[in-house]
Structure formats: C-alpha cells, structure tokens
C-alpha cells in the first residue's frame, strides 16, 4: 500500500514546518531519492499524474519492496522498452568486473563487505503486486537531449509549478556541471546518460515526490562517495566523476571518500541534493517523526529522516 501522512496538528500544539535530514552515508542517486520520498509518504496520485504526462513513450516504472542487509526498504525502478537507450543502470557496462555475475541472488543476503551491485530482481509491491506506470513505445530511437529539449518536456508535465521549478533547477545544475567538465557553452551540452529517458523520469519523479511532502528545510551534512573508475560514453572516468565534483564544489556540499570501489554519488543524485539543501548542520538534538528508506542498485541503502517537530 502507498502511505501518505499529512502534517496536521494536535489541539493546543502548533504544527511545525517539516525538516528533512538527508543521510547519504551510502551515496545518493535519483532512484534512491525517489524511493525514499515514496517511503516517507509522497502523494501517489501526484506521482502517477506526473509520470503519465511526460511527453515521451518507451518506459514504465516499477515500485516495490526489497531487502538490503535484511532491512526492508522501497525500490523505485525505471524500465525502458528499448534496451539500447543507455547504460545508466547497466552495472556490467558501468563497472565491468565489479558487477555481480548474471543470475546472482538478490541483495537480502547478509554480505556487509560486498561491493557489487545487487541484481535486478523485482520484489512484489505493497499489496502483493508490482506497481507499474506503463507507457507504450512508439519510436525505438531516443536521441540525446539538451536543455532546449528537456525543459519543455518538464513544462508539459502535470505537476505543480513548484515541482516544475525544482525539476528545471536540477537539470540546470547538471547542465552547468557537464558544461564545465567538457568546456562547452551550456546550450551545447547534450546529456548522454543524464539526459537519457530514465534520468528524465528520475528527475521528474524526484521533484514531484519531494514537492508533495511540503518540506521546508533540508539538511545534508555530507555525501559519501566511493573511489575507482566508472565507464561512460566518454570512456573510463575517475570516481567521483567530473560532473559530480563540479556540483559539490559549486554548491559547497561536504564530501567524504570511502575505500569502497564504485560510484556512490551520481551527478543526478548530487544535483538533487544541491537543489534542495538548505543546511549542512544537524541540530544538537531532534525528534524523528518518520523515516524513509530508498534502495539503490548496490547492497546498501540511503536513509532519510524527516521531522516536523521543533528542535530540542
């Protein structure tokens, strides 16, 4: 079942603004963030309307539950009808020998030292069935897109003006970072992986789910990133990739590198954090009113805590 929790108030108690603590100790990507927002209670109707209104075909979305190290969390996946669309979520393409073997079991196995991405199995949804937002593919060719093509797609989506503004902001952050990385004018940047269909869906879903929760403050103490290399259409790049480095540098987001190999923080995830962050400092104490757990492709999770209570 989808769950939605309104802020509300009790008699004699003033309703407080919601605050979100974004714990990125396991990194952040677009799908992890969306899953966590859904787990917190994002409006399912708003998400459905937004996804149905994206002016393109060839994708569907699955929302379900998976276990990471034995912990139940939400899983958000964008599936493409055309397998050749891109390699954003193709772990064998991205990491080569770092990726799990085909047919490997799901990530519910207790393997704390495991670095491989978990398999692409999909567990059943909240009510025992997988949730789908289906779109029939009309054209197997999806060209790489620039901001000139992406921003009108966002404007055409059925979501609030606030959500549209956030989605545009996220893509502009990514575009500026890519422009700097490739020494190109912003209007000449074409988004390869980031501009591919699944990433557009991730950004629209991130904007609409976050907007539906009416969060006023977002605390992002740091982003935890891996090391090593990752493969993309430009070749093999160091982790963190240049676009991610440019985002955390421009928006002064603290970053911590771990010894684990692989990309924990994607440019889309970094851009989402940059777009919504209002602070990097947690209060000395606080009351946790609800937690949302979003599953990524690896065998760890991104935890997000939100509080609409006053700091203590």
Question: Where are the regions a protein language model picked out?
Answer:
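Divalent metal-coordination and catalytic microenvironments
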Residues: 27, 76, 198, 273
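Glycine-rich nucleotide/cofactor/substrate-binding loop typically near the N-terminus or early
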Residues: 39-181, 241, 250-255, 261, ...
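Short coil/turn connectors at secondary-structure junctions
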Residues: 16-17, 29, 72, 185-187, ...
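Glycine/charged-rich beta-loop-alpha catalytic/anionic-binding loops adjacent to active sites
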Residues: 16-19, 181-192, 226-227, 251-257
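Short, Lys/Arg-enriched N-terminal segments with co-localized hydrophobic residues
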Residues: 2-15
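N-terminal loops that bind phosphate or other acidic moieties
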Residues: 18-38, 42, 46, 150-152, ...
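Conserved small/polar residues in nucleotide/adenosyl-binding loops
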Residues: 305-310
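Mobile "lid/hinge" segments at catalytic clefts and subdomain interfaces of large enzymes
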Residues: 218-304
